[in-house]
């Protein structure tokens, strides 16, 4: 599978596009301790240098066909321009076994508006229809109930509980794995 150009996806509430350096300051402002405690790859405090590394990592992942990380723009009707509200991506793409992982987060002030649910739907549709994946999984902490609801609304099912999976300070946190299979 080769990517010719970065895909842009569009839904009723959001547009998904390639991340850019110009997004860095907004991402820092949206990242809070409340959000980062539920993310596997982010530790507070999240600084501009961290975001720039993430954007470079995202661009490299796309170039190397390992991941597709999208910026999420909210099509808020009351705003003259779209608002960046965070990121979603297909990661760890395995073209041989036709599977990948999904990860996402939404700025706290934009949660509860259906944005994550629509973003996940757009990305799994792209993964199944364009990338021809047969399974997409998500790793989520058991206490992250909003993310679990988003996955369940999109027909993901809990497939595994991994005990003491993710390091946190001097201990480890449990993780749940949710998976959706391509029915086509």
Positions of the model-derived regions?
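Short, conserved alpha-helical segments within structured domains
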Residues: 43-47, 68, 143
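A short helix-loop-beta-strand connector motif used in the catalytic cores of GNAT acetyltransferases and
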Residues: 56-71
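Conserved GNAT-fold acetyl-CoA-binding loop/helix
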Residues: 36-57
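A short hydrophobic/aromatic micro-motif that marks alpha-helical segments and, especially, helix-coil
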Residues: 47-49, 62, 170
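Acyl-donor (CoA/ACP) binding surface of acyl/acetyltransferases
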Residues: 1-24, 29-37, 73-184
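Short, polar/charged, Gly/Pro-enriched helix-capping and turn/loop motifs at alpha-helix termini
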Residues: 41-42, 65-69, 134
């Amino acid at each position: 599978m080769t990517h010719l150009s970065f895909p842009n996806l569009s839904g009723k509430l959001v547009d998904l596009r390639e991340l850019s350096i110009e997004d860095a300051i907004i991402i820092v402002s949206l990242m809070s301790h409340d959000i980062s405690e539920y993310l596997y790859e982010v530790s507070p405090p999240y600084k501009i240098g961290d975001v720039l590394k993430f954007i470079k990592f995202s661009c490299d992942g796309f170039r190397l066909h390992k991941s597709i990380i999208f910026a999420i723009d909210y099509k808020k009707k009351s705003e003259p321009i779209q608002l960046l509200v965070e990121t979603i991506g297909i990661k760890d793409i395995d073209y041989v076994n036709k599977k990948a992982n999904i990860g996402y987060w939404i700025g706290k002030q934009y949660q509860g508006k259906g944005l994550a649910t629509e973003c996940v739907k757009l990305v799994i549709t792209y993964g199944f229809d364009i990338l021809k994946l047969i399974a997409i999984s998500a790793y989520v902490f058991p206490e992250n109930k909003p993310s679990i609801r988003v996955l369940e609304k999109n027909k993901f099912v809990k497939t595994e509980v991994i005990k003491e999976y993710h390091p946190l300070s001097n201990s480890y946190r449990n993780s749940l794995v949710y998976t959706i299979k391509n029915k086509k």
